[in-house]
């Protein structure tokens, strides 16, 4: 599965928005995601991509745009 599309699918499910043309938009500052949605996103990413992202190690600034999320998932897949 394409990582970018998989991440966008999860974000679409959580936000109800197509973010494919907003890859560098801060999804927290624009109100699309909150802390509860972050936990749901992490759980979905872990399940879909078979990666481990402990909530305790989640730094929102590293996961605040779709592009950053894709990059983090790709780096975790390669560990």
UniProtKB/Swiss-Prot annotation:
Keywords: Cell wall biogenesis/degradation, Cytoplasm, Phosphopantetheine, Phosphoprotein
O-(pantetheine 4'-phosphoryl)serine: residues carrying this PTM: 35
Name of the molecule in the record: D-alanyl carrier protein
NCBIfam families: dltC, PRK05087.1
Localization terms from the record: Cytoplasm
Pathway: Cell wall biogenesis; lipoteichoic acid biosynthesis
Modification comment: 4'-phosphopantetheine is transferred from CoA to a specific serine of apo-DCP.
Xref: InterPro entries: ACP-like_sf, DltC, PP-bd_ACP
Chief subcellular location: cytoplasm
UniProt GO molecular function: D-alanyl carrier activity
Family the entry assigns: Belongs to the DltC family.
Domain Carrier: 1-77
GO CC annotation, single: cytoplasm
Family annotation (Pfam families): PP-binding (PF00550)
Record function comment: Carrier protein involved in the D-alanylation of lipoteichoic acid (LTA). The loading of thioester-linked D-alanine onto DltC is catalyzed by D-alanine--D-alanyl carrier protein ligase DltA. The DltC-carried D-alanyl group is further transferred to cell membrane phosphatidylglycerol (PG) by forming an ester bond, probably catalyzed by DltD. D-alanylation of LTA plays an important role in modulating the properties of the cell wall in Gram-positive bacteria, influencing the net charge of the cell wall.
Primary gene name: dltC
Organism: Lactobacillus acidophilus (strain ATCC 700396 / NCK56 / N2 / NCFM)
Gene Ontology biological process terms in this record: cell wall organization; lipoteichoic acid biosynthetic process
